[in-house]
């Protein structure tokens, strides 16, 4: 609330992290009421309890979610029973929420006053961290390039990636914007499964004894390959999955042939080729360096300044001589050789 934010600012806090449930309107009001920077959640797992204050794990398993030891109680399957004991819904994951993904609302959040974004990453692996952070860096930079008069990066340097970031290709239970725009009709739950489902890859066209034919989705990011994990929701409403042994075009050969209904939609829950790429070095961050080589009365000077504002000048006492041919290109070529450093010559 505005009052809580003002109290925290008065107490000396230099940054405030907003609750996941905070709407855009409330974010805007808080930003107008305080001077400290605001940070907001933008991606990752959601807790079914209000603002993550959950005591179910502690009560049932002796593991406090408020101390980082959540037993994932809300990801279990439950029955929904009425007052007379009749089962209305059986064996569904009634408390399991989708994962947050606010990619489409980044600019709205920035305009509302958010100055940094928080990605939930409890128990996530290195591949997840690489892909998701690179994805949001890319999306934020697009906004900054389009509106340089309004926003600038808080950090320096440029990261060169060896892969194309895509948040849909990392672990997720399906996505939701949560309550950013208030309580809407858009689903926030994932009743079928608490596990990763992944993006749609296509529909089953034909089934054989050891293989099936896939009609690929128009949004298929990469071909199906051996090692991929595919899944589908069965007639009982439960998620079923299998690994791909090999793929020959649109003909898919599973390790173990599942009972696939014709026309069923398949998702890729494990992207083998993408994870293999992310397991290797995937980024190099460099700082731009401006270099000036000039004459001074006692010899020569070399001035270097990076984009953070750090500046160094070196002086060399040498006698001035007139070269028979211009040395300008040779000097530029030599000074541009920065080797294995974190710098790249800008000018």
Predicted regions and their residues:
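Active-site beta->alpha loop and helix N-cap motifs at the rims of alpha/beta catalytic domains
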Residues: 1-2
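Surface-exposed amphipathic alpha-helical tracts and adjacent flexible/coil segments at the periphery
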Residues: 6-347
């Amino acid at each position: 609330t505005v009052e809580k934010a003002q109290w925290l600012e008065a107490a000396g806090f230099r940054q405030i992290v907003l609750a996941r449930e905070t709407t855009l309107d409330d974010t805007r009001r808080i930003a107008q009421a305080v001077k400290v920077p605001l940070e907001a959640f933008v991606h990752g797992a959601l807790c079914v309890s209000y603002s993550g204050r959950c005591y179910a794990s502690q009560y049932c398993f002796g593991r406090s979610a408020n101390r980082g030891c959540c037993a994932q109680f809300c990801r279990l399957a439950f029955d929904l029973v009425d007052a007379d004991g009749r089962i209305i819904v059986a064996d569904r994951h009634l408390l399991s929420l989708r994962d947050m993904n606010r990619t489409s609302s980044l600019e709205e959040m920035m305009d509302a006053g958010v100055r940094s974004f928080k990605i939930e990453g409890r128990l996530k692996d290195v591949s997840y961290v690489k892909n998701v952070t690179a994805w949001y860096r890319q999306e934020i930079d697009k906004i900054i390039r389009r509106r340089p008069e309004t926003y600038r990066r808080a950090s320096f340097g440029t990261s060169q990636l060896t892969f194309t970031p895509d948040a849909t290709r990392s672990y997720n239970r399906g996505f939701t914007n949560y309550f950013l725009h208030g309580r809407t009709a858009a689903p926030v739950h994932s009743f079928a499964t608490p596990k990763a489902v992944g993006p749609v890859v296509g529909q089953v066209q034909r089934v054989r004894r050891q293989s099936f034919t896939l009609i690929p989705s128009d949004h298929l990011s990469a071909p199906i390959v051996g090692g991929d994990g595919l899944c589908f929701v069965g007639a009982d409403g439960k998620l079923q999955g299998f690994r791909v042994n090999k793929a020959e075009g649109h003909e898919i050969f599973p390790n173990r042939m599942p009972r696939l209904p014709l026309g069923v939609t398949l998702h890729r829950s494990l992207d083998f080729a993408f994870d293999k790429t992310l397991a290797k070095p995937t980024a190099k961050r460099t700082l731009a360096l401006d270099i000036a080589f000039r004459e001074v009365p006692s010899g020569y000077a070399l001035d270097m300044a990076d984009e953070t504002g750090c500046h160094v000048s070196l002086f060399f006492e040498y006698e001035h001589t007139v070269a028979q041919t211009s040395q300008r290109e040779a000097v530029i070529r030599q000074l541009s050789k920065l080797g294995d450093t974190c710098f790249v010559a800008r000018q």
